[in-house]
Each structure stands twice: as structure tokens, then as C-alpha cells.
UniProtKB/Swiss-Prot annotation:
Protein name stated in the entry: ATP phosphoribosyltransferase
Keyword set includes Nucleotidyltransferase: no
Any GO CC annotation of this UniProt entry: cytoplasm
Taxon lineage: Bacteria, Pseudomonadati, Thermodesulfobacteriota, Desulfobacteria, Desulfobacterales
Entry-linked Pfam families: HisG (PF01634), HisG_C (PF08029)
Notes on activation and inhibition: Feedback inhibited by histidine.
Protein species of origin: Desulfatibacillum aliphaticivorans
GO MF annotation terms: ATP binding; ATP phosphoribosyltransferase activity; magnesium ion binding
UniProt-listed InterPro entries: ATP-PRT_HisG_long, ATP_PRibTrfase_cat, ATP_PRibTrfase_HisG, HisG_C, N-reg_PII-like_a/b, N-reg_PII/ATP_PRibTrfase_C
Listed cofactors: Mg(2+)
Length: 292
């Protein structure tokens, strides 16, 4: 009987981004409607769709061997799991999200202490209660099923603790952020007993390596160019390569072929500079995976 890894894939806002990341990493996950057990092109993995809020619970109790969920929900559930690696991606960006404390724009509240005796709405009830209790501030924390920002506007709460990536929804409701309570990102986690199993640990490490390499590749591009030999030093001097560039002679020519990997953010400024220094035939190409 073939060993298999029981892997949890987050349902909801992270689902599409996670499936796309797996695709770029070499695994194709096919989700069927009204079916929580998608197919995957790997006989050694069995997938299950699970809410990110509950993922760490199922990983901790062994229902799943491993899964992807937010650092925030691991903290909320106080789950005792092995964190394999951080994977910084989300539904809209490649930056960590933030859980923030916010109040109405015209609220007199300026500090945490000003919320003594206040009512706070949030989906992260356990974390929020512990956060204020640790600071000796007595507050009433209520669970919010959604549209949390509207609770302050409608007077149902004095403040909210809500996750944000861009702050656009918070600003749209006229709210003001008092304090950032935590940063969060996706993490690959494993059941501690499963992590001790050689097959499962090897498979989980394979997942971690390939998923991280695909995320790294998102931020980088490759550049290839031809450079006259006499101008090579000038061109190479301005290259912000991860490592030394690859340089080779063109066949029966005094020209060189130069190839580098650079951060995508520098390309728009770098290419004009390369042309000025004498490079020609510059080609930019995307990368699927980058491993260090």
C-alpha cells in the first residue's frame, strides 16, 4: 500500500491563490463542486478542502497531516503544530496581512487604554480577549460573522479588530486605525506525529521547497543580452545580479552573451541603462521556480 500525505487546502479567500501556487509549483489540484476532496496529480497526496479558520485544529488532532493556513488562525486556536515554513501570499498581494484595531474616524479613542469597558467586534475572539487581558484592559469582545467594519458605523460596537491587506475597506467605512495587533501570512504546518514519520516529513519538505521556489520566482525575471567584448566591463558593472552573471562567447564572434536574474522591480530602469552601455538584443523572460 502506497504511503499518502493528508493535505489540507484552505477554503474561501485563500483557495484560488493556493491552487494557483500549487500549479506553478508542479501540482494540479482539481476542485469539484460540492466535493471537499479535490483531485491532485500526485498519488502520494490526498487533498481535503478545509476552512482556514479550522485548519490548525484538524492538523493538530491528526485528521490532516499537513495544511496551509494563516499564522493568525494558529494563534487564535492556540494550536500545537509544527510550523514548516512561511509562505507569504494572499488573495490580493504578496505581502503579510495585518490585524488592526480600528474605531470610527470621529471617535475620541486614541489608545488601547481608552477602550476600557468598550465593546469590540471581531472574528478573532480568543486572540483579542487574550491581547487585552495581557495588558490589563477590560473589554467585551463579541464574535462578528462578517461586515465587521459596519459594526462601528452602526453603533453595534465601539471598535473592531479586523484583518486588512490594503486598508481600503477600513478607509471606505470612515474608520481610523488605532494600533496594529499582529501581522499574519500563510504558513505550511504539520501534525507533530506526522512530522516524525520519514515519508511524510520528506513529502512535506518537498512541498515547502517547491512552493517557496514558486513564490520567489514571482519577484524575479531573467535577462539575456548580447554585448560587444570591449563594452562587457561597463555593462557588467551595472548588473544587480543575484550572483555573478553568466557570460559566454558567441560562436566565431567578438560578442558575448550575458545572462542574469534580477528583481522585477529594477527592470524598467535597468534596460535603458544597459542599452546606453552598449548591450543589444535584450530579452526579458519570466521564471517558474527559483531555489537558493
Amino acid at each position: 500500500m502506497t504511503d499518502t500525505l493528508k493535505l489540507g487546502v484552505p477554503k474561501g479567500s485563500l483557495q484560488n491563490a493556493t491552487i494557483e501556487l500549487f500549479k506553478r509549483s508542479g501540482w494540479k489540484i482539481n476542485v469539484h463542486s460540492r466535493n471537499y476532496f479535490p483531485d491532485i496529480n500526485d498519488a502520494e497526496i490526498n487533498c481535503a478542502i478545509c476552512r482556514a479558520q479550522e485548519m490548525s485544529i484538524y492538523v493538530e488532532n491528526g485528521t490532516l497531516d499537513a495544511g496551509l493556513t494563516g499564522k493568525d488562525w494558529i494563534a487564535e486556536n492556540q494550536s500545537d503544530v509544527h510550523v514548516v515554513t512561511d509562505l507569504v501570499y494572499s488573495k490580493v498581494s504578496s505581502r503579510p496581512a495585518r490585524w488592526v484595531l480600528a474605531v470610527a474616524g470621529d471617535s475620541p479613542v486614541k489608545t488601547l487604554e481608552d477602550l476600557q469597558g468598550a465593546k469590540i467586534a471581531t472574528e478573532m475572539v480568543g486572540f483579542t480577549k487574550r491581547y487585552f487581558a495581557e495588558r490589563g484592559i477590560d473589554v467585551e469582545v463579541e464574535f462578528s460573522w462578517g461586515a465587521t467594519e459596519a459594526k462601528v458605523v452602526s453603533g453595534l460596537a465601539d471598535a473592531i479588530v479586523e484583518v486588512t491587506e490594503t486598508e481600503s475597506t477600513i478607509r471606505a467605512h470612515g474608520l481610523r486605525i488605532i494600533k496594529e495587533l499582529m501581522q499574519t501570512n500563510t504558513q505550511l504546518i504539520a501534525n507533530k506525529k506526522a512530522w516524525e514519520d520519514p515519508f511524510k516529513q520528506k513529502k512535506i519538505n518537498q512541498l515547502a521547497m517547491m512552493l517557496k521556489s514558486a513564490l520567489v520566482a514571482e519577484t524575479l525575471v531573467g535577462l539575456k543580452m548580447n554585448v560587444p567584448e570591449e563594452k562587457a566591463d561597463d555593462v557588467i558593472a551595472i548588473l544587480p545580479s543575484l550572483n555573478a552573471p553568466t557570460v559566454s562567447h558567441l560562436y566565431k564572434s567578438t560578442w558575448l552573451s550575458v545572462e542574469i536574474v534580477v528583481d522585477v522591480s529594477v527592470v524598467r530602469d535597468l534596460i535603458p541603462q544597459l542599452l546606453e552601455k552598449g548591450a543589444e538584443g535584450i530579452v526579458e523572460y519570466s521564471l517558474n521556480k527559483v531555489m537558493f
